[in-house]
């Protein structure tokens, strides 16, 4: 899990729910929320203010370019890569070969790319988990559970050598 002094990136941060939660967990660390969409950046800044999170820096732009001058991360969440996943992973591992990475995927293409990256980057620890939610909906006098699209959560890290 996150430590209080973690240095985190939230890449594809959207409106910042993950970044804000990371910042609350890493009380004495820092979180960099990277987002390319202007509308999401504005909402992210509003959410940061609403939750009074001071250890969070909003970075407007696309990874990996906007991350090059940031400090080396200990933990990274990738919620979106804008098609730059391999370049992002290369940049992260160059900064810290032992960084813990969590990434989500919903499309078959993203799932395939993350699965290939788990192998190609030779992570010593790698796992994929599928999570699915079902919502109840009325169908006549019955209630049926309608499955939502599954989300795949990938975790990747290489062990430090003693």
Predicted regions and their residues:
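Short SAM/SAH-binding signature in class I
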Residues: 72-80, 87, 100
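Short beta-strand element of Class I
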Residues: 28-32, 101
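Conserved class I S-adenosyl-L-methionine
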Residues: 5-14
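S-adenosyl-L-methionine
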Residues: 34-73
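C-terminal substrate-binding/active-site "lid" region of AdoMet-derived donor-dependent transferases
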Residues: 89-147
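Core SAM-dependent methyltransferase catalytic element
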Residues: 140-162
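Conserved SAM-binding loop of SAM-dependent methyltransferases across substrates and taxa
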Residues: 15-28
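Short beta->alpha hinge that forms the Motif I/post-I loop of the SAM-binding pocket
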Residues: 35-40, 80-81, 106
């Amino acid at each position: 899990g996150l430590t209080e002094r973690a240095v985190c990136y939230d890449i594809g941060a959207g409106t910042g729910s993950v970044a804000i939660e990371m910042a609350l967990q890493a009380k004495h660390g820092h979180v960099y929320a990277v987002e390319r969409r202007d509308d999401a950046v504005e909402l992210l800044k509003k959410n940061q203010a609403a939750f009074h999170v001071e250890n969070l820096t909003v970075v407007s732009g696309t990874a990996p370019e906007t991350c090059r001058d940031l400090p080396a991360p200990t933990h990274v969440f990738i919620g979106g890569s804008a098609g730059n996943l391999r370049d992002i992973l290369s940049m992260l591992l160059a900064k810290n070969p032992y960084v813990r990475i969590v990434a989500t995927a919903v499309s078959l293409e993203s799932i395939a790319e993350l699965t290939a990256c788990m192998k190609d980057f030779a992570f010593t620890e790698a796992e994929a988990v599928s999570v699915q939610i079902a919502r109840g909906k009325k169908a006549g006098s019955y209630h049926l559970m309608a499955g939502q699209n599954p989300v795949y959560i990938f975790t990747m890290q290489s062990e430090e050598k003693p």
